[in-house]
Amino acid sequence: MKIAVLLGGISRERPISLKSGENVLKALKKLGHDVVPIDVDENFLEIAPKLKEFEVVFNALHGHFGEDGTVQAILDWVGVSYTGSKVLASAICFDKVMTYRVLDGYVNFPEYTIVKKPVKESPYGFPCVIKPRKEGSSIGVHICDNSNQLYNDLSEELKKYNEMMIQRYIEGRELTVSILEIGKPQILPVLELKPKRRFYDYTAKYVSGMTEFILPAPLSVEEYQKVANSSLRAFELCGCEGFARVDGILKDNVFYVLELNTIPGLTDLSDMPASAKAAGMSFEELVDAIIQTAVR
């Protein structure tokens, strides 16, 4: 099969996308496919029509432009099959506020408010969490313990973003749930994350040895059902397709969804490949399964 792999991109997650894309390229070549890498830049719209010559496009982009529905809209315009969720689901899941609006009343998530200028008070007390409304890889996320830290961190981040979220801090077990459509959406073994830092931030995600993976997460039957049901519900409500990852916190038998990732990382340290491995899937088998979701 002739497959194009989109990688790199123009977001702050470019370094991670390059790693994901390189791993996907290697896997597809091992599987015997004719593979062409495409490093996406601002001129993507000009070259996009050439993608018609490919049977499938594997989208390994992360962050703005590649994961927010923009590239998906271009690929739909070209008329080529591609991996992952389509335009609407991608746009919803990349915008945490829109994600929560869709999930409201169906799935638990931490309370939040939006600010467009620095403030010193949190509606939820301290510690609290601040994060960009639209961003990935925990970029721009801070846990603030007092008024001064809240004000200073917001001041810094609002130089980069038009608005920020202040969210209730929930101290619990960090879980990530990888979902793969094999006929229907199925949950891979739930992964519990134990970062050596305060939370699963950019460094904990991408520096080897900074996070302990516990697979499968030790959950009671009741806990597993709540985590699984909430994750599948979120996947379906947001209209996700192919594959995705649901990140959340388990506390007092309640699973709080933090976000949905429509293009999960596929680096050597990423969560979804680890969960797939725990399910008995090699990385090549995972990539092949993702490709199959695009050609069905």
Swiss-Prot record:
Q: Does the keyword Glycoprotein apply?
A: no
List, in alphabetical order, the Gene Ontology terms for molecular function in this entry. ATP binding; D-alanine-D-alanine ligase activity; metal ion binding
Record InterPro entries: ATP-grasp (IPR011761), ATP_grasp_subdomain_1 (IPR013815), D-Ala_lig_Van_CS (IPR000291), D_ala_D_ala (IPR005905), Dala_Dala_lig_C (IPR011095), Dala_Dala_lig_N (IPR011127), PreATP-grasp_dom_sf (IPR016185)
The record's subcellular location field reads:
Cytoplasm
**GO CC, alphabetical:** cytoplasm
| Cofactor entry | Mg(2+); Mn(2+)
- Matches recorded under Pfam families: Dala_Dala_lig_C, Dala_Dala_lig_N
Question: What note does UniProt attach to the cofactor annotation?
Answer: Binds 2 magnesium or manganese ions per subunit.
Please tell me where ATP binds in this chain: 125-176
Keywords of this protein's UniProt record, alphabetized? Answer: ATP-binding, Cell shape, Cell wall biogenesis/degradation, Cytoplasm, Ligase, Magnesium, Manganese, Metal-binding, Nucleotide-binding, Peptidoglycan synthesis
Q: Which residues bind Mg(2+) 2?
A: E259, N261
Q: Please list the residue ranges annotated as the ATP-grasp domain.
A: 99-292
**Gene Ontology biological-process entries:** cell wall organization; peptidoglycan biosynthetic process; regulation of cell shape
PANTHER family, per this entry? D-ALANINE--D-ALANINE LIGASE (PTHR23132), D-ALANINE--D-ALANINE LIGASE B (PTHR23132:SF23)
Similarity annotation: Belongs to the D-alanine--D-alanine ligase family.
Provide the function of this protein. Answer: Cell wall formation.
The protein's name is D-alanine--D-alanine ligase
Q: What organism does this protein naturally occur in?
A: Pseudothermotoga lettingae (strain ATCC BAA-301 / DSM 14385 / NBRC 107922 / TMO)
Lineage, opening ranks: Bacteria, Thermotogati, Thermotogota, Thermotogae, Thermotogales
